[in-house]
Amino acid sequence: MAFRNWIGAFGKANALDVNSDLDRGYEAALLIQSLELEYYGDRPIRPDLELSVPKSVQATVLRKFRVAINVCRASLDQLEYQRSQLDPQELRQLQLIESVVNRYSPKRVSTAPTMTRDPDPLPRSLLGVFDKVRRQLNPAGEATLVAGFRRRRDSTLISLKVLLLLILVPLLVQQVSRTYIISPAVDRFAPDLPFLSYPKPQLEEQAVEKLRVYKAEIEFDALLRGDTIPSQEELQQQLGKKASELKEEADAESTHAVKNVLADISATIAFVVVCLFSREELRVLRGFFDEAVYGLSDSAKAFAIILFTDIFVGFHSPEGWTVLLDGIANHFGFPARENFILLFIATFPVILATIFKYWIFRYLNRVSPSSVATLRGMNGGG
């Protein structure tokens, strides 16, 4: 019984060491990728390359890189012979660590048997079978699986929580501030501050069109009832009353743009505050997204890329861009200029498509070549 307890304690400690090494290596690999993206344009870090930053900042970047790459190498050495203990999610994390280490170790010797390497006393596959049997007989195996499940569950809950905060808090702040603070304040000071209700030609044109339609409705209703058409004085009186109503509507609508801008600023401030107070949770969210993306199959990745590109740069995307630009112009109180919209549609989707192709060529082709092949096949070989 004591021997069995000793085996269980040893297996539990070994599993905890594996998780600790994997977490340290994964965090270090993500740090190296962030340094590459921020300072080296998604290229490998080179100590001999002069950056357009102060010397102290470059020294700090290189120091972080050296520490992180050493952690990745140490974690990879510890986990090299324990792959059979890892679940699919942990294997994807290990593959990320390997890709980072291999990127900075071009002469790294492959773990596969070669003619220049001393043969192992026993086949590694046989050792893996023994290790699998040992883990199945390990009394602490269930506790290890439960601990791993709880860790992934906590990561998912934290990610969903911070994602909801990033979405709901700015929206709630925007609506509440606009309804109870910004709108009353703007309505109170708009008569004294002309810039809060600056005149808009499109509002005047809309008011004139409504007044013309109202006059035609009066004459049409009189003809339908068989009455005489109102005299010029009566018509002038009714049109004057309607013009006063339209002026009040135009004055109220002229302040909507200022209210929208101030509400958007308050929502942006709320978003920044949430980000500042949720830095640790944002790191967990980033890891959650990385695992979700790496967990997709090649067909799923290709399908998502094709769907995204067809929506924004596909054949029917101009209609969507037109609706989007009209909505933005109306939100900020600007007239929807047809020439600007046509120029935007003729240039921006082309730039966006070029960025997609460059990203596929530089990043996706290196990280997941099979996804690129699947993408070409699903996209008709293009």
Curated annotation (Swiss-Prot):
Signal peptide: none annotated. One of its GO terms (molecular function) is proton transmembrane transporter activity. Its main location: membrane. GO terms for cellular component: plasma membrane. It holds the Pfam family CemA. The chain crosses the membrane at residues 156-176, 257-277, 305-325, 340-360. It is found in: Cell inner membrane. Keywords: Cell inner membrane, Cell membrane, Hydrogen ion transport, Ion transport, Membrane, Transmembrane, Transmembrane helix, Transport. It is a multi-pass membrane protein. Required for H(+) efflux immediately after light irradiation to form a rapid H(+) concentration gradient across the thylakoid membranes. Together with PxcL, contributes to transient H(+) uptake following dark to light transition. Belongs to the CemA family. This is Proton extrusion protein PxcA. The gene is pxcA.
